[in-house]
Amino acid sequence: MTEVTELSRPEGEALNTREVLLNLGPQHPSTHGVLRLVLELDGEFVERVDPHIGYLHRGTEKLAESFTYTQIFPLTDRLDYLCPPSNNLAFALAVEKLLGIEAPIRAQYIRVMMAELARISGHLLITGALPMDLGAMTALLYVMREREMIMDLLEMITGARMHTSFCRVGGVREDLPDGFFPKIREFCDIFPNRIRDYERLLEDNRVFLNRTKGIGVISAEDAVDLGLSGPNLRASGVDWDIRRDEPYEIYDRLDFNVITRDEGDCYARWRCRVDEMRESIGIIKQCIDQMPEGPFQIDMPTIAFPLDKDRVHCSMEALIQHFDLSAYGFKVPKGEVYSAIEAPKGELGFYIISDGSPKPFRMKVRAPSFVNLQALFGVTNARYLADMIAVLGSLDPVMAEVDK
């Protein structure tokens, strides 16, 4: 393993510096979106960082109050737009909890399989983007090759590459298409070797290791105090994963490991995501092998569209059902609920208040990127300006999810 050189701040009067303010972003290729950081610098050392957010605010939570529950799914696509199936799933589970229903088992397997594909897709991007931010572009070209395969699979299932809107309350929009299983098995067979390619590119790269190891360290205590979740939490040694500790859907039927590391630095956060992709492949394989027969949508005319779409053209009852759900939606009992999943970025939760109408009275999104961004306050003190790029990239925020 290549030796990592530790950088330290010069002491005494070796350098004559003065404090300056520097704007990093909102238009900067390494801020991962429209994030503006106002940095207080003493020479090259960051004394303070002040994030300015809101450049991508679209009012998702307020818009939801004017939409029926089914119409909200496209809004959730645009939170973490790298992983729409996870956003769809989190929202669907919250509404189903209010209704007191569960999706059919086949639909749950399909949902989990798509959520893990989304996890791999999201982790792939930061696996290549973090090295690219630090000057090693080759890794990004490698990961985009495999990410294109995932986009093809999502397009095969949903008809869309990014904004899938595939989940529905009580199931999924439609069943898996013919020819899907051979395609996803092929991907599962190829992908583990491709992960090893990424590791060979970067594990002995002296520049990458110097720029990530020992940089941006977050202790386990600080990670918990800041409310971090997902790989950013587990990279600090906190063994917590909602899929295992508060299982939803069929995760309690699946065998997988929760990846943790103790270092809490930029490299540990990058490494956690790489190793999690292997676990996701194992989960997808189990979903394929265990996939049961049965309906992909709950059979409740007051909530779900007709399972047989052809009936809409020849049955007055089915036509009325389809029209009512499309035009007016379905009513949800009065109450409030919070439901969370383990999204690629961390704990993604939806808090919904229902007043008994077909539209939520209030919806609050617990976006993991928003919470994880707080870590910038605690990890950049007296570090080089160049380290800011590594720290921000390793936290892997998506600004659409931060600003909502």
UniProtKB/Swiss-Prot annotation:
Membrane topology label: Peripheral membrane protein
Gene3D superfamilies to which the protein is assigned, alphabetical: Cytochrome-c3 Hydrogenase, chain B
GO cellular component, one term: plasma membrane
Keyword Cytoplasm: no
GO terms of molecular function: NAD binding; NADH:ubiquinone reductase (non-electrogenic) activity; quinone binding
Compartments, record wording: Cell inner membrane
Catalytic activity, EC: 7.1.1.-
Keywords, ordered alphabetically: Cell inner membrane, Cell membrane, Membrane, NAD, Quinone, Translocase, Transport, Ubiquinone
SUPFAM superfamilies: HydB/Nqo4-like
Record field: catalytic activity: a quinone + NADH + 5 H(+)(in) = a quinol + NAD(+) + 4 H(+)(out)
Pfam families: Complex1_49kDa
Subunit structure, interactors included: NDH-1 is composed of 14 different subunits. Subunits NuoB, C, D, E, F, and G constitute the peripheral sector of the complex.
Job of this protein: NDH-1 shuttles electrons from NADH, via FMN and iron-sulfur (Fe-S) centers, to quinones in the respiratory chain. The immediate electron acceptor for the enzyme in this species is believed to be ubiquinone. Couples the redox reaction to proton translocation (for every two electrons transferred, four hydrogen ions are translocated across the cytoplasmic membrane), and thus conserves the redox energy in a proton gradient.
HAMAP family, sorted: NDH1_NuoD
Family stated for the protein in its record: Belongs to the complex I 49 kDa subunit family.
Protein name: NADH-quinone oxidoreductase subunit D 2
Species annotation: Rhizobium etli (strain CIAT 652)
